Amino acid sequence: PVPLKLLAANVPGVKAVLSTLGPGGDTIELPPAAPDLHMHASSPCTELSPAKYNASQSDVATGLGMLEWALNLFLERGDHSWSIENVSTPTTRKVFAEYKRRFPREVDFATLDAADFGAPQTRVRLIAAPPSLIKLLQQMPSARRVSVREAFEAAGLEVAAEAFKNQTRNRDGSPCMRSVEEQSFTVCASHALTWCSRDGKTVRVMNSKESAALMNFSPTWRLPTGSRTGQRAVGNALCVAMSKAIMQAAIAIYKDEPVALYIPATLTPMPPAPLALPVHAHIMSPTPPLSVRADQEAVLKSIETLIKGYRHEPLSGIAP
């Protein structure tokens, strides 16, 4: 897969492993659970997203199976620090509410907007993690809202119009639009946002480089070639601002120190988070924390594992 190859090219020294999980799948060796190891999972959310109205019960069950598989893995391993990201829907919230009831000391979750952490877009996602990590994320002060214009200036890009629109319409039939002086709509994998005039007239569709700027990716981050492939990779990524916040919280817990003051990601140079195609679930931790150098004591170990394919079977080690 192209994003997997580009991940290794974008982050020198990272180890990427392509594996098939589930019954009959590959056996992968992960480092043992440790206080300085953070595990992250972003299972495919396409079948669970509210945007997919025609998802069958089988599709939804498959999506939930992947979500539960990742959570069961962390619980069975006894990981000290972990996080899961997915869409926030009544269905996904119900799943995590049940796990929280069964494992109150190990599992908590919250619906968070990446805009509160410095992303130049509205991006509401469900984040699950140990209770201490969720508490720190909820306690972080909201970042100053970053506009599309600011994000593009930081990335060295020109705005192509004074407004943009998504694929939805208002009740009167007019397109849903926003000014470049505001935050963008959520960046999606299936289709990019569209530049338009203030009266809604289409100028052109955003390219993947522009979409990447709205996800806080560095201008130097290499993207897959091809507009559809690039957009799919960017739209399915964990937003860099949220990734940074999660790791800041994880580091604070590990070091038993207050969380460092958060600075919006679009205003500071930083390496972006890994990408994933819709057919992948990935278990990962972001690249070594930005504020922690290799010679410092609190560098978290980082692993990168992209998982291709999935067949769900409950883990026997997790009792109801």
Predicted feature locations:
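SAM cofactor-binding core of SAM-dependent methyltransferases
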Residues: 1-23
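C-terminal target-recognition/interaction regions appended to catalytic cores
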Residues: 150-320
